Amino acid sequence: MTTATKKTLALFALAPLLLSGCVSTESSGSGGGSVNLIKSDTLSVCTNTPYKPFEYEENGKVIGLDADIAEAIAKDLGVKAQLTSISFEGLDSGTGLTSGQCDIALAGISVTDARKSKMAFSNVYFEDKQAILVPKDSKISSAADLKGAKVGAQQATSGEEYAK
C-alpha cells in the first residue's frame, strides 16, 4: 500500500470532522440528509489548481489530497463530488462559498484570523511551515537579508503575507 493510499484511508475517518467545519450553511439547495447542498445530489467543491500534492489536474480531472478528502466527504453524504478550480482570491475572500458557487472549499487553505472572519474551518488536517527558498550558493541566510529585495509569492496566500 502506497503512502498516499494510507493517508487517504486515514482521512476517510476524518471526513465527518472535516465536513462539520467546512460546509456552507448559506446555500439555497437541499439534500444530503441534514446538510444543505447547492445541488441535492452533488457536493460542490471549490479548489485552486495547481497545488501539488493537495490539488492538481491530470488528464482533465482534479486529483490530490484535497480531492480525495472531497470524494470521501461526498461518499459519506451519499452524493457525488464535483471539484471546480477557481482563483485563490475567490477562495481567500470566501466569495466561492457566499456566492453559491460551492458548498465547501478545499485548497490547502491556511487558517488565519482574516479568513476565520469569512468562513468556518474544519479541524486542521495539515500543518504547514512557510519558508523562502534561495539558491544554495546565495549570500542570503535570513529574512533580514531580503530587505528591499523582490520576492515572488502567490497573491492572497499566507505565503505572500510571510514574504512581506
Tell me what each language-model feature is.
Residues 1-12:
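Bacterial N-terminal signal peptides that target proteins for export
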Residues 23-26:
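Bacterial signal peptide processing site
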Residues 31-32, 38-107:
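Extracytoplasmic small-molecule ligand-binding "clamshell" domains
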Residues 52, 62-76, 109, 127-164:
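Bilobed "Venus flytrap"/periplasmic-binding protein-like clamshell domains
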